């Protein structure tokens, strides 16, 4: 173990190398079945974003959001970085943060000072608050973002990945059929790629459910 003085006095390159080792990419995963699925989803999402940029710019935000979400999951899987914060005890963290008088962590998601966060009974755990509406992302329902964060924190990465695939299927189905009505060449191309992407997301969700979620449910029934 290095002391505080040793860490401060060591050569800067040593710290950079240590940080890079923490984000080592598993090349075997990138060529695996799951890695190829994520890379295909990432490429098709980027193509759809380009098509929407050239035709209907109002729909490109959905494709861009899914692109960054898929990129984040590819990073977590390829680096296995999710193992460092799997099942974090967020309620204790939030309770301690609130007692210290600091801002609520979920309130940091808000970009609007006019909308006050409100609790969402039923889905939001006790002590949690709904973040205020984010201007550049439409809120589907009150408390959606806090519920999504709660789901990701308290479930495995496979369950969160399953939720990502299901939400992407719904989003791209709606956006693709809405874009094809414009009869623009780029919009029609986005519709075709969107249908292909939806089928890939559906296959990915099926594989996740069959390999990670179904065995856990069967073990729970046996107990």
UniProtKB/Swiss-Prot annotation:
Domain MARVEL: 29-213
GO-annotated molecular function: cytokine activity
Location in or out of the cell: Membrane
Alphabetical list of Pfam families matching this protein: MARVEL
GO biological process: chemotaxis; negative regulation of myoblast differentiation
UniProtKB keywords: Chemotaxis, Cytokine, Membrane, Transmembrane, Transmembrane helix
Record carries keyword Membrane: yes
Gene Ontology terms: cellular component: extracellular space; membrane
InterPro entries: Marvel, MARVEL-CKLF_proteins
Tissue: Highly expressed in the brain.
Keyword Endoplasmic reticulum: no
Segments traversing the membrane: 35-55, 56-76, 162-182, 186-206
Bilayer topology term: Multi-pass membrane protein
Coarse class of the protein's main subcellular location: membrane
Family named by the database record: Belongs to the chemokine-like factor family.
Protein's name in the database: CKLF-like MARVEL transmembrane domain-containing protein 5
Source organism (scientific name): Homo sapiens (Human)
Lineage: Eukaryota, Metazoa, Chordata, Craniata, Vertebrata
